[in-house]
Amino acid sequence: MTDDDRIKLEPSWKAALRGEFDQPYMHQLREFLRGEYAAGKEIYPPGPLIFNALNSTPLDQVKVVILGQDPYHGPGQAHGLCFSVQPGVATPPSLVNIYKELQRDLNIPIASHGYLQSWAEQGVLLLNTTMTVERANAASHAKKGWEFFTDRVIQVVSEQCPNVVFLLWGAHAQSKQKLIDGTKHLVLKSVHPSPLSAYRGFLGCGHFSRTNSFLEQRGMAPINWALPPL
């Protein structure tokens, strides 16, 4: 049995990523994570939710990709979808600004929670390029191997899916543009929605309406960005 036979992953992704789990970088990443757990470190998101982005949005259903950097590092926040937090947790500042732009762009009322699962289930792949983090230690798992894996995820979407909208917010996300075939897909870029930068162009970018226009022009259902109440 190979390592990728033991990973609990949605079937379409498992087929597309078969072989990644036997790559040397993945063995090194797995050893790093084992060591962190063995040392008693608290790692987010919880193990069953590490691949939640892929498990919530099958490859053949991807319409939109939003890239984040690494998971939230506070207790109870991260659940494997970038920018999203678990129910009952305060909405983080960057997500508040995303909601402000949704309100300005599409007149969608600001949600009372930060749980973006309904976006994922409509085909919005909410992918952090680093998929784990140590509690209270931002970027602690950067450059440990996750980036090789998530770069491959981005490439697979670009290669195998038609007419995807990639939302690249901030320099880190925009560094992944080289992995995307811009002749097949729509790439929209802006500064990050963080309070440090949102007022320099994220607020006013119109990415959500532009995404839906692109999808509708190609005969695809638009994303309902309004979140259901919890």
Swiss-Prot record:
The organism's superkingdom is given as: Bacteria
Parts of the chain that traverse the membrane: none
> Transcription regulation: is it a keyword of this entry?
no
Q: Which GO terms describe its molecular function?
A: uracil DNA N-glycosylase activity
E.C. designation(s) = 3.2.2.27
- Which sites are catalytic? 70 (proton acceptor)
**What does the record list as GO biological process?**
base-excision repair, AP site formation via deaminated base removal
Which Gene3D superfamilies does the record associate with it? Uracil-DNA glycosylase-like domain (3.40.470.10)
- Provide the function of this protein: Excises uracil residues from the DNA which can arise as a result of misincorporation of dUMP residues by DNA polymerase or due to deamination of cytosine.
Q: Does the keyword DNA damage apply?
A: yes
Put simply, this protein is called Uracil-DNA glycosylase
Q: What catalytic activity does the UniProt entry give for this protein?
A: Hydrolyzes single-stranded DNA or mismatched double-stranded DNA and polynucleotides, releasing free uracil
Report the subcellular localization. Answer: Cytoplasm
* UniProt main location, coarse: cytoplasm
One cellular component term (GO) for this entry is: cytoplasm
- Family recorded in the similarity comment: Belongs to the uracil-DNA glycosylase (UDG) superfamily. UNG family.
Pfam families of this UniProt entry?
A: UDG
